[in-house]
C-alpha cells in the first residue's frame, strides 16, 4: 500500500498521468517496503489527510531503483501505473472495524507511507471496496 495526501497527488492525478515514479520516500521501513516491490505486484492507493480511504489499485511497472530525487543512493523509487479505482472508497474507520485487518500496518504504524500487506489483507480491502464479502468474491472465482 502507498499513501498520499490527495491535495499533493490524488488518485485522479495518478489516473490522468497514467504512470508515476514513486519518489521522495525518506523513512527506512517504507524504503525497505519499496525495495521488496517487483514488477507485476499489485498495490493499494490510499488517500491520507482528510479523506483517509483506500481508493484504488495500482501495479508496479518498474522494480526499485535509486531515487533520482535523493542525494544519497540509499533511497529508492518504483514506478507505478493505475489499474482501477475501487467501486467505493474503503474508509479507515471500516478498516479499523474489520477484525481481520487488526494487524494492518495502516492501523499499527499510521505514519508509514509505504507498507506491505498480506494477500488476505489486500483481498479483504478490495472486496470491501467492490461491495463484496470475501465469500461472495471467492464464489465468483469458481
Task: Give the predicted meaning of each segment.
Residues 1-39, 132, 140:
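Compositionally biased, charged N-terminal/linker segments
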Residues 7-9, 87, 122-124:
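Short, acidic Gly/Pro/Ser/Thr-rich loop/turn segments
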Residues 44-45, 59:
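Hydrophobic beta-strand signal
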Residues 46-52:
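Short, charged beta-turn/beta-strand-edge "cap" motif at the junction between a beta-strand
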Residues 13, 89-95, 125-128:
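Short, charged, solvent-exposed linker or helix-capping segments at domain edges/interfaces
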Residues 123, 127-142:
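Polybasic, lysine-enriched low-complexity intrinsically disordered terminal tails
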Residues 56-115:
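Aromatic- and Lys/Arg-enriched surface recognition patch
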Amino acid at each position: 500500500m502507498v499513501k498520499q495526501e490527495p491535495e499533493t497527488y490524488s488518485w485522479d492525478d495518478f489516473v490522468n498521468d497514467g504512470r508515476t515514479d514513486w519518489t521522495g520516500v525518506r523513512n527506512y521501513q517504507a524504503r525497505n517496503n519499496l525495495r521488496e516491490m517487483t514488477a507485476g505486484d499489485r498495490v493499494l492507493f490510499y488517500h491520507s489527510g482528510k479523506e483517509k480511504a483506500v481508493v484504488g489499485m495500482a501495479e508496479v511497472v518498474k522494480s526499485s531503483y535509486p531515487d533520482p530525487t535523493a542525494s544519497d543512493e540509499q533511497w529508492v523509487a518504483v514506478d507505478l501505473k493505475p489499474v482501477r479505482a475501487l467501486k467505493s472508497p474503503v474508509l479507515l474507520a471500516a478498516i479499523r472495524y474489520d477484525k481481520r485487518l487488526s494487524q494492518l500496518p495502516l492501523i499499527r504504524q499510521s505514519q508509514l507511507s509505504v507498507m506491505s500487506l498480506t494477500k488476505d489483507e489486500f483481498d479483504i480491502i478490495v472486496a470491501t471496496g467492490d461491495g463484496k464479502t470475501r465469500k461472495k468474491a471467492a464464489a465468483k472465482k469458481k
